[in-house]
């Protein structure tokens, strides 16, 4: 089975549309979204509509949780709070109800894949996995994570290989899974990459070949940025799209 996995769209319709168009060449059998459909960008409803139509299952991200009243975001910085408040006012009843019902994780038993937005440890706290020491916390739940655990949240592409007693960070490039290891993979961001590559990030996992692939695609950043400004959101949310941070 060829699985398309993407995350952190952040209301960037132009990036999401480019990713879904690129996926058409990948012979994808099923799609999964790892959360944060909303937040930061100018097209929350349009992106929610597309994700609902495309993904078999979508995971709850922290911005999704904030917009839908499922977490306290009073500690977020002012511009981020403003965007979340604006999106809450913009979302249709259907899309708001959808966000309210999203799960924190999903285990795909048939392919031994765990899906979450952030770390699988303390799911409701949406913790990051940037480095091996953070991935090492997952060793305590070795029997509960998948052969591969796919996450978003950091907006970075990261790969960590785990044994029951050791964690190693691998290069963020295509790789084949080894049977005696487990993997935590951060799939990057569709709508707001933060690795100084402004192209939208998306991934493919071939569960038959046990092969994971990272993909990037260019999109109309100028239009996406213009929509941020027209929505009267923070100017930096538009500017950062051009530099990929």
Task: Tell where the protein language model's regions lie, with residue ranges.
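Active-site environment of divalent metal-dependent phosphoester hydrolases
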Residues: 10-15, 39-41, 65-68, 107, ...
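N-terminal active-site segment of His-dependent metallophosphoesterases
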Residues: 1-56, 229
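Active-site neighborhood of divalent metal-dependent phosphoester bond hydrolases
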Residues: 53-116, 120-122, 126-145
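Beta-strand-turn-beta hairpins that frame and shape the catalytic cleft
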Residues: 1-4, 107-114, 178-183
């Amino acid at each position: 089975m060829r699985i398309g996995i993407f995350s952190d769209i952040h209301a960037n319709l132009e990036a999401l549309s480019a990713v879904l168009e690129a996926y058409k060449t990948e012979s994808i059998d099923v799609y999964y979204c790892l959360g944060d459909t909303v937040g930061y960008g100018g097209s929350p409803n349009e992106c929610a509509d597309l994700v609902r139509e495309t993904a078999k299952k979508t995971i709850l991200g922290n911005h999704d949780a904030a917009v839908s009243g499922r977490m306290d975001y009073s500690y977020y910085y002012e511009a981020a709070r403003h965007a979340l408040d604006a999106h809450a006012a913009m979302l249709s009843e259907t899309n708001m109800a959808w966000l309210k019902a999203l799960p924190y994780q999903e285990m795909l038993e048939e392919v031994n894949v765990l899906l979450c937005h952030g770390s699988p440890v303390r799911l409701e706290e949406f913790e990051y996995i940037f480095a091996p020491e953070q991935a090492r916390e997952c060793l305590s739940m070795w029997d509960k994570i998948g052969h591969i655990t796919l996450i978003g949240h950091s907006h970075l592409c990261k790969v960590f290989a785990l044994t029951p007693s050791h964690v190693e960070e691998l290069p963020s490039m295509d790789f084949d899974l080894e049977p005696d290891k487990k993997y935590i993979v951060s799939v990057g961001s569709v709508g707001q990459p933060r690795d100084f590559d402004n192209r939208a990030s998306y991934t493919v996992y071939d569960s038959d070949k046990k092969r994971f692939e990272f993909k990037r695609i260019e999109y109309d950043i100028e239009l996406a940025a213009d929509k941020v400004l027209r929505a009267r959101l923070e100017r930096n949310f538009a500017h950062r799209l051009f530099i990929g941070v």
